[in-house]
């Protein structure tokens, strides 16, 4: 390989993987295309970031966005002739497909390779609506024109290859990266005064995630009602924002949990909340590789998680095969798996609709976590597992992949 630094262009919602961008910036001559205003940290030269700054997120305008993006991206590729273009998230992945095809036809940059980075389980993520149909069609007919498809877990690789036969020899596994030392440093920042009373003399469970269908927090809140019947001082805090915020708050009010469950919105530093909590509870219906589970482990927080597809099992129970049949709850090496929830909205008061089996199981596990000190100690070893996803380890995997591609 030549000593000359290779040229990379990375495209997508770049702030979602800031650690990776910093890593690329050290190794390669890079440009970063961001569709929306990123959270610029000052750690990467702003001149390297090409901001499309798209204001509207109206799905009806999406086809026009693709055309506009195609023109802009082709112009960038013609100018910079990158050795490699990496796109991140399916929004960016679909946007690059016309560029790949036009580049093949018109030879705009003959040596440019393309890697599509998939973050989620597409079969669960894209079930309804025109946008979902377009994404699935892209997987089925067009993703094969990329050089490599990056997935984050063994199970997601299996799902994608079984549903989209043309991608069978394209997929490679590279997990997310985490700056473990930095997360631990951030966790030491003091809590703001208005939050301190929540943690005073209480056993606190924490959940972090967007307030959307995918994250299943209504199941968690309903389950927590059962916990408070036995432990009235127990608390649940949920960090994140999203379209279900009002619905979730309404559910909290209906269940008279205003003094037990707190929706604290998006927090710039969620790690200090993790540090002050006693147990992390993950209620998602589906995932890719859940960041927050690994972040909780990095602070040695006990974790209870649904065994949703994909991610939690591979993180918390590396001793299991992804296809193993298990009984729930399953007490894994680094966390506890509970029975996954169905895609069912339940907003009624508990008196109208009793807890389902999965909710009872989750509630009973939370109660057990409060009562069993030995169990908490057993699952306070998560840092050991989180280190498997540390940036210093994953950077080597990325480097091998990139050097093998270009």
Swiss-Prot record:
- EC number in record: 2.4.-.-
Which Gene3D superfamilies does its entry note?
Answer: Glycogen Phosphorylase B
Q: Which UniProt keywords apply?
A: Glycosyltransferase, Transferase
Q: Which Pfam families match?
A: Glycos_transf_1
One GO MF term on file is:
glycosyltransferase activity
Question: What InterPro entries does the record tag this protein with?
Answer: Glyco_trans_1
**First-level EC class:** transferase
The similarity annotation says: Belongs to the glycosyltransferase group 1 family. Glycosyltransferase 4 subfamily.
Mind telling me what this protein is named?
Answer: Uncharacterized glycosyltransferase MJ1059
Source species taxonomy: Archaea, Methanobacteriati, Methanobacteriota, Methanomada group, Methanococci
């Amino acid at each position: 390989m030549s000593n000359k630094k290779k040229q990379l262009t990375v495209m997508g919602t770049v702030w979602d993987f800031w650690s990776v961008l910093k890593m690329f910036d050290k190794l390669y001559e890079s440009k970063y295309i961001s569709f929306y205003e990123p959270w610029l940290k000052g750690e990467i030269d702003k001149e390297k970031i090409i901001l499309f700054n798209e204001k509207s997120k109206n799905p009806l305008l999406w086809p026009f966005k693709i055309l506009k993006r195609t023109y802009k991206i082709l112009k960038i590729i013609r100018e910079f002739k990158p050795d490699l273009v990496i796109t991140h998230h399916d929004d960016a992945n679909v946007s690059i497909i016309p560029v790949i095809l036009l580049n093949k036809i018109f030879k705009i940059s003959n040596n440019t390779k393309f890697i599509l980075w998939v973050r989620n389980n597409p079969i669960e993520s894209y079930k309804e609506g025109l946008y979902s149909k377009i994404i699935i069609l892209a997987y089925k007919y067009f993703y094969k024109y990329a050089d490599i498809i990056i997935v984050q877990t063994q199970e997601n690789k299996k799902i994608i290859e079984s549903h989209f036969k043309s991608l069978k020899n394209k997929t490679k596994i590279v997990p997310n990266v985490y700056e473990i030392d930095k997360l631990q440093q951030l966790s030491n920042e003091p809590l703001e005064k208005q939050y301190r009373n929540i943690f005073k003399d209480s056993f606190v469970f924490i959940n972090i995630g967007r307030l959307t269908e995918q994250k299943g927090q209504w199941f968690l809140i309903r389950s927590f009602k059962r916990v408070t019947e036995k432990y009235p001082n127990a608390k649940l805090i949920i960090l994140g924002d999203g379209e279900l915020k009002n619905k979730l708050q309404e559910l909290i009010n209906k269940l008279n949990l205003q003094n037990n469950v707190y929706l604290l919105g998006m927090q710039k530093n969620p790690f200090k909340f993790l540090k002050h909590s006693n147990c992390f509870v993950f209620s998602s219906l589906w995932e890719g590789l859940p960041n927050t589970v690994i972040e909780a482990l990095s602070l040695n927080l006990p974790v209870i998680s649904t065994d949703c597809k994909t991610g939690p099992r591979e993180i918390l129970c590396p001793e299991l095969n992804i296809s193993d049949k298990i009984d729930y709850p399953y007490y894994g090496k680094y966390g506890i798996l509970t029975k996954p929830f169905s895609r069912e909205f339940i907003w009624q008061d508990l008196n109208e609709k009793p807890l389902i089996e999965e909710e009872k199981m989750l509630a009973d596990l939370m109660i057990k976590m409060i009562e069993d000190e030995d169990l908490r100690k057993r699952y306070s070893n998560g840092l050991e597992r989180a280190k498997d996803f540390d940036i210093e380890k994953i950077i080597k995997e990325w480097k091998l992949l990139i050097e093998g591609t270009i």
